[in-house]
Amino acid sequence: MNIHEYQAKHILSKFGVNVPKGVVVHSLGEVDGALSQLNSKVVVVKAQIHAGGRGKAGGVVVSRTLDETKTSIKNMLGSTLITHQTSKDGQKVRKVYLEEGCNIKKEYYISAIVNRKQGQVSIIFSTEGGVDIEEVAATSPEKVIVCNINPVFGFQGFHGRNLCFDSNLSLDQTRKISDIAGKIYKAVLSTDANQIEINPLVETSSGEFIALDAKINFDDNALYRHPDIQELRDYDEEIKEEIEASKHGLSYIKMDGNIGCMVNGAGLAMATMDIIKYYGAEPANFLDVGGGASQKTVTEAFKIILADDKVNGILVNIFGGIMRCDIIANGIIAAIQEIGINVPLVVRLSGTNFELGKKLLDDSNLNIITANDLSEAAYNIVNIVRK
């Protein structure tokens, strides 16, 4: 689960990380009251969406007068921001964050992530802040320092010193950055976050370190332990199909293509998307119905896929292990009879009782095209949609 910048900063402040003072605004009518709470002539107006790259898209504006601030807010509210992290349709701005400006001396990058490969939390630090850390890692990998924290001992002072050792930082700077690293490490563990990122972490002209931007992503599976964090969820920022899918235990991710996919198993789902791309088309979604799909689950999966207007065809790829293919076939037939499908449908079944499942589909007198293998199925749906 993602949250907004202002929410992330509020959480970080609870762990002792310095953040600029700011106020959330939903309309122009709230501006005067919001500005009265700030003690700076320079105000930064920030669009609040669940995506990075806002600055390059016009979603972060520095204003120095009341008129500039109001103009920036007016231009942002209700607009659609398209960044490298949004879909091509972008995301609508429903709220902005007004924040006190500060005198920036230097920008840094720091984050704490759950490193599943290492089985530890990793702290990542760079003196090159304010830009994508991926770019820095690609062009100047020596400037990205990664420190893995053994969970038995937790974050120690030497971890902070290791982060700053080759960065030509003073003892005071090292001490302050180490302190922040320890705080975000504690925040990750305490909130069950997958990642906490501060970019940029700025050093001001007075030597203070402030989180100028912050992002936090939480582990959905641990949210039941944090009802206060669950309340921060902004459903307006999430894709409605993904929300609906989660209600039915489906793993769904919307994509930009036109061929809908229904598959059981994440690995098989990714392979299905790959082969669709191999034949020259683009998948409209990732959808894993899981190993215990029922008729109701299949029906809901079809509804979610068809809610995307871009879908011109559907490929169902099921491997029957524990789940029998004849049960899946009956579920597909019942789902089609219930909701109707007006786009081409290709189904590939393999595994337990796949012959019976294929016969049920062929004898159903419904507009279902069966395939013997995944390659044939992908080739058929791609070519049918192209016609």
Curated annotation (Swiss-Prot):
It catalyses: succinate + ATP + CoA = succinyl-CoA + ADP + phosphate; GTP + succinate + CoA = succinyl-CoA + GDP + phosphate. Mg(2+) binds at residues 199, 213. ATP binds at residues 46, 53-55, 99, 102, 107. Substrate binds at residues 264, 321-323. GO terms for biological process: succinyl-CoA metabolic process; tricarboxylic acid cycle. Its EC number is 6.2.1.5. InterPro entries: ATP-grasp, ATP-grasp_succ-CoA_synth-type, ATP_grasp_subdomain_1, Succ-CoA_synthase_bsu_CS, SUCC_ACL_C, Succ_CoA_ligase-like_bsu, Succinyl-CoA_synth-like. Heterotetramer of two alpha and two beta subunits. Succinyl-CoA synthetase functions in the citric acid cycle (TCA), coupling the hydrolysis of succinyl-CoA to the synthesis of either ATP or GTP and thus represents the only step of substrate-level phosphorylation in the TCA. The beta subunit provides nucleotide specificity of the enzyme and binds the substrate succinate, while the binding sites for coenzyme A and phosphate are found in the alpha subunit. This is Succinate--CoA ligase [ADP-forming] subunit beta. It comes from Ehrlichia chaffeensis (strain ATCC CRL-10679 / Arkansas). The lineage of its organism: Bacteria, Pseudomonadati, Pseudomonadota, Alphaproteobacteria, Rickettsiales. The gene is sucC.
